[in-house]
Regions:
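Acidic/polar, glycine-enriched structural segments that form the non-catalytic walls/loops
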Residues: 1-155
């Protein structure tokens, strides 16, 4: 938890929380909250999956960014392990679900969504991001995508 103040004096309260799912070892949930103290205007929240810091250690086999979820299937070098990361997210404004198509992001090292909302003092945006990670140590390589998506959708 922290408070951020811009050079113009606009203040936001920010909170981030990671929740591990004990009954689903491949799944975690990240919750981000941004609350306006004295700011009126647009807020953009990015929900992203990155490939990794060391681009020569991995390469993307296939990416997909859909309306409800995105996934990245990767090969890790030199270990010859494949993994699939899948992500879904929901945005709430003042505890009410925002029904809005996010802007899709698909680049070489990052995929995901950008979601913007206007806020005023007292408004709270909450982004709930679910991430599933499965690898070829536990699943057949040709079923990684299906298993990652199933982790997200069978909650």
């Amino acid at each position: 938890h922290f408070v951020a103040t811009s050079p113009k004096g606009h203040t936001l309260k920010v909170r981030a929380e990671r929740q591990l799912m004990m009954d689903a070892k491949n799944l975690m949930q990240l919750v981000y909250e941004v609350q306006s103290v004295n700011y009126t205007g647009p807020i953009t929240i990015l929900s992203l999956l990155r490939g990794g810091e060391d681009a020569d250690q991995w390469y993307s086999l296939m990416n997909h960014v859909g309306d409800d979820l995105c996934w990245r299937w990767m090969q890790l070098q030199p270990m010859n392990i494949q993994l699939c990361c899948a992500m879904s997210c929901q945005l709430k404004k003042n505890d009410k679900l925002v029904v809005q198509r996010p802007i899709k992001i698909e680049k070489q090292d990052v995929i995901g969504y950008s979601i913007a909302q206007r806020i005023k003092p007292g408004d709270k945006l909450t982004l709930c991001k679910k991430v599933a990670v499965v690898d070829s140590n536990d699943y057949a390589k040709d079923h990684l995508i299906d298993h990652a998506i199933r982790c997200l959708t069978n909650l």
